[in-house]
Amino acid sequence: MVPLEDLLNKENGTAAPQHSRESIVENGTDVSNVTKKDGLPSPNLSKRSSDCSKRPRIRCTTEAIGLNGQEDERMSPGSTSSSCLPYHSTSHLNTPPYDLLGASAVSPTTSSSSDSSSSSPLAQAHNPAGDDDDADNDGDSEDITLYCKWDNCGMIFNQPELLYNHLCHDHVGRKSHKNLQLNCHWGDCTTKTEKRDHITSHLRVHVPLKPFGCSTCSKKFKRPQDLKKHLKIHLESGGILKRKRGPKWGSKRTSKKNKSCASDAVSSCSASVPSAIAGSFKSHSTSPQILPPLPVGISQHLPSQQQQRAISLNQLCSDELSQYKPVYSPQLSARLQTILPPLYYNNGSTVSQGANSRSMNVYEDGCSNKTIANATQFFTKLSRNMTNNYILQQSGGSTESSSSSGRIPVAQTSYVQPPNAPSYQSVQGGSSISATANTATYVPVRLAKYPTGPSLTEHLPPLHSNTAGGVFNRQSQYAMPHYPSVRAAPSYSSSGCSILPPLQSKIPMLPSRRTMAGGTSLKPNWEFSLNQKSCTNDIIMSKLAIEEVDDESEIEDDFVEMLGIVNIIKDYLLCCVMEDLDDEESEDKDEENAFLQESLEKLSLQNQMGTNSVRILTKYPKILV
């Protein structure tokens, strides 16, 4: 038995699609064709069109498709008056095919697509991102745009320099123009000053302009006074001065006596140094040693006054700076080291106020403007020279600098590379082999302190027969094992070899003398002497290389420290010059204005005494033609 409800459902299911299809075809859009073209499953429209209670859902789907509710007005009455059946397939409205169908069907109509995109949650989710991008673009434009907030001026500038000049000339004014304003009217600021240079210095707080930069840490400041305070912080922090200067422990500069007994070394230094210097070193024994005793070579070239007492920056700029050139030298470095330590010592908490006030003459104004300008030029050139030398030393080729200066190149392994065979054949003059072979693979070892002539080859016995050459080749194979990190060594023949290649400091296991002497008639003593010579050469060269690397690192550290000191002095002098320029401008303007006023008054008095007195005008009259 088939239930009656199933039969009714089948009859209504076969009849309803005709009405719905006809209604949709009348509108000019066939939904089934659209779904087939897009490759999407066609929905069961029979149950939707037959359900009267679900009519608002049909309106939603047609709006999503782009029909804008026209289907409801043109729907046939048969489709709407059909029997109401329970709704079973509501999942078709929320499935992804309908969303994609709406997106694809909206393409012909642009107006409906804009409405649907504005109401969809995806569009609302993407709109804030676009707003943020627009806000960023506006922010970039606002970074360039600067508004004048002086009494609602509202002028717009694209550079902070122009805004600052506008404030100084238009709003602050000058006394000669009778429009001088010493009170700040920027926004809510109510700062009051007494001089024009004070208000112009205060205006830098409101303008995003930082022209004064620190050469040590690359920070920028708005006023030279702020940079001065920052430089004092560099000195007091001890980033440069707290580091202990002098030779490192265990380097070539220190002797074995200093390692064994440091007290004897201190007593010997105090005996050799004059009593004034010894007393100064004893007085500062509790503080870290900043200035070690000068070497003998440097102390001979320095004057006696420079060795005995420290000096202030003002005294150096006015008295002794003309004796030096703006080029780095040990004498100038040693002299500059005597300027800053008193400032460092006396800035501590354990020093009395009298000593502190006495040492702060480094930052007192005791020089003329011309002297400060010349000193600023000197230290600026010195800083550039030292910076360029340091950059060239760091970026230049290490092989070229070492070969040109006579330094020993340091290899990555303990094995020192042998010199080229063709370069040493010119000493003997035995053969004519091209000098261009293997020039890029091996770096020649140049010893500037030791002879490189035929003295090294005098002690080597001559090799006459071919058997000796064959035995020597066999011996070199045993003495020089294969090293993977070093390139292949050149082959040495009996006619062209002048110096044996050096071995490692740790010689590998050599074969016994029986095997060496069994094949040839060579003497075992000569065999032992060859190995011993090559080993000692390698040890000496490696020690020299290590000591020279340590000395270079110490010299580089001293150079970097001195460059920092020079930069601090240069920045300080630049701040002094800028302050003096501001003061001179204000004073010169006031003096010029006073002089003009007095001259005008004198002329007016003279003209009043005469019969035909002419009234002097403050402005030029307009001439009408």
Curated annotation (Swiss-Prot):
Motif YPX[LI] motif 1 in this chain: 450-453
Bias (Polar residues): 77-94
Free-text description of this protein's post-translational modifications in UniProt: Activated by C-terminal proteolytic cleavage. At neutral to alkaline ambient pH, the signaling protease (probably RIM13) cleaves RIM101, removing a C-terminal 8 kDa peptide to yield the active form.
ZnF (C2H2-type) intervals: 146-171, 182-206, 212-234
Motif YPX[LI] motif 2: chain residues: 620-623
Region (Disordered): 1-138
InterPro entries found in the cross-reference section: pacC/RIM101, Zap1-like_Znf1, Znf_C2H2_sf, Znf_C2H2_type
A GO-annotated cellular component: cytoplasm
Nuclear localization signal (motif): residue ranges: 228-234
GO BP term, example: positive regulation of division septum assembly
Consequence the record notes for mutating C153S: Abolishes transcriptional activation of target genes
Record key words, sorted: Activator, Cytoplasm, DNA-binding, Meiosis, Metal-binding, Nucleus, Repeat, Repressor, Transcription, Transcription regulation, Zinc, Zinc-finger
Broad class of the protein's primary localization: cytoplasm
GO molecular function, one term: DNA binding
Membrane-crossing segments per the record: none
Origin superkingdom: Eukaryota
Subcellular location: Cytoplasm; Nucleus
Protein role: Transcription factor that mediates regulation of both acid- and alkaline-expressed genes in response to ambient pH. At alkaline ambient pH, activates transcription of alkaline-expressed genes (including RIM101 itself), mainly by repressing transcriptional repressors of those genes, and represses transcription of acid-expressed genes. Required for meiosis, sporulation and invasive growth.
Family listed: Belongs to the pacC/RIM101 family.
Miscellaneous: Present with 1822 molecules/cell in log phase SD medium.
Oligomer status and interactors: Binds to DNA. Interacts with RIM20, which probably binds to the two YPX[LI] motifs and is required for proteolytic processing.
Protein name from the UniProt record: pH-response transcription factor pacC/RIM101
Gene: RIM101
